[in-house]
Amino acid sequence: MNILSALLADSDAELERDIPGCRTRRIAPGVWECLPERSTGSPLVLCAGVHGDETGPVEVLAELIDAACAGELMPRRPWLFAFGNLAALRLARRYLERDLNRCFRQPPHASGAEIEVARAHALAQALAIFARHGKGLLLDLHSTIRASRHPSFAIRPAPVPTAEGTPGLLASCGVPVLVEAGAEAPTFSALGAREHGFEAYTFELGRVRPLGAGPSEELDALRNGLWRLIEAATPSAGAGLPRVYRVQREIVKRSNAFVLHVAADAPNFLPLQAGQLLAEDSPQRWFAEEGECVLFPNPDVAPGTRAVVLVRPVEGGA
């Protein structure tokens, strides 16, 4: 049985066999660390499935783990691999009670949304254990739930110095666009940057697909890029610097009276007109500023949650 099938049947599943040439141990349900006997690279964290309906990256990660167990992929760096929200993944739902990727600043015993808060705490503990091997690279792999003018892009939660070389890293994984955000976000990648000094990214790759449909061809570059990262190989030559955007502000829904004047199905990176009314939450109103583009518009979030992100292109590259 492959690792994904095993986890869907039982959260406490173990790897069917050890990864050759490595010491492997499970440090939380759906989370393993793999320590090669011969390590030539810095630590690497790969996480997928923080949202249970984003299955393409989950299947890519599962394929890589199965290839490592079969001796086809040879890890050459300390490697943590994690499947995020197993309960939601089984039900093909984004989350059960609360968006897991908004829970990584919650105290471990926060009230409400027990499933996601508890899972965030388990993932944070696993990351802290693995971080003892030193600083490295963290990639949290997602799919988009909407159309996008840039089908694949990365979000860097803090403009930290790069260890792997951002242009080569992004290009080798088929990601031509970088969004620079703040490290205070409650996301898994921001946790890695903020608490452990990882060079951390959230990858948004392709569109949501049903589990079992298999990764789409648009994820081939991701699969190949991750394979090279795990083997500590030099990233393949890229096509120059990524296009860079920077987060300018976020609009938070404060009450159920909130109205978003951007269509809920508006594509990511849709340019806005300066002065355009964006949202209302009486008595407050928000208007677009020069050069801003929309990212992740969602009026249906719970009060107190971000409803839209506004970004602006940056001249030059990373």
Identify the function of each model-found stretch.
Residues 1-318:
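Structured catalytic-domain cores with a bias toward divalent-metal coordination
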